Amino acid sequence: MPQKRALVTGASRGIGKTIAVALAKAGYDVAIAARTVSKDDPTPEHSVTIHRQDSRALPGSLEETAALVEAEGRRSLPLRMDLTDLPSVETALATVIDRWGGVDVLINNGRHIGPGLMDTILDTPIDEYMKFLQAHAVSAIRIVQLVLPAMLERGGGTIVTISSGAGYDWYPANPPGHGGAGLGYRLGKSAGHTIVGSILVEHGHQGIRAFNVDPGFVLTERNSLDLEATGFDASAAAPPAAVGAAVAWLVDSPEADDLQHSNISAQALVLERGLYPDWRKP
């Protein structure tokens, strides 16, 4: 039986890390991409607003994720990748194709964090908007362009975009900084959200499956850092591993095919199907 191979971007921590581990448990070798390769060489995070400087490094690295993948008896392939830097994206994909001949599953999970995520239209510098579009749209499209030909040659593959309600709800419930996201983040997510539809209409008849997955509110390392000073009640947040369980099910289950043309709530899917028994929403 041919070995199953997956690529997960943004896999040094949070949702991407748990997706990588869940896919390894499901029998996939997993290429993992992010900026932070080693815990000994941490990459500082950017502040989500121009009004606060915060460059603390978050826990997590590709090195640690790779160890978890390999603990499941699967191969890992750590790749340094910065989604705001297209050459680094292309270099990482060239490595995957050279080493593994491509992948059967792509999880476009990586995202850009920076000023504009929680800033108003007027406060956000125009170059910050460009970074969101580069990371969430241009780089995501380029990754699809680079993995899709081999999938088509093999007669099938699965592509998942980790989306957000910020990407498909055109009228936000709250302004940025008061429970809502800034236009920079919303632009990036909405642009990335449209990729799946184009994949399906152009290549669905050729065996390519594609899904948009909204993780909902998840208590990642990044969110924990942002919330620690606010006193916000995060008790209803899902653990990242719940999203990992949802994605692993979508990738391998034929029953998931009917969900391809919808906005999939990872949390609702997990609860409905009992995919992560350790979590029950309060």
Give, region by region, the residue ranges found by the protein language model.
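A short, exposed helix-loop element centered on a Lys and neighboring polar residues
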Residues: 144-145, 197
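Conserved Rossmann-fold SDR core element
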Residues: 102, 193-199, 203-218, 257-264
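A short helix-coil junction within the Rossmann-fold of NAD(P)-dependent oxidoreductases
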Residues: 26, 99-100, 113-116, 146-158, ...
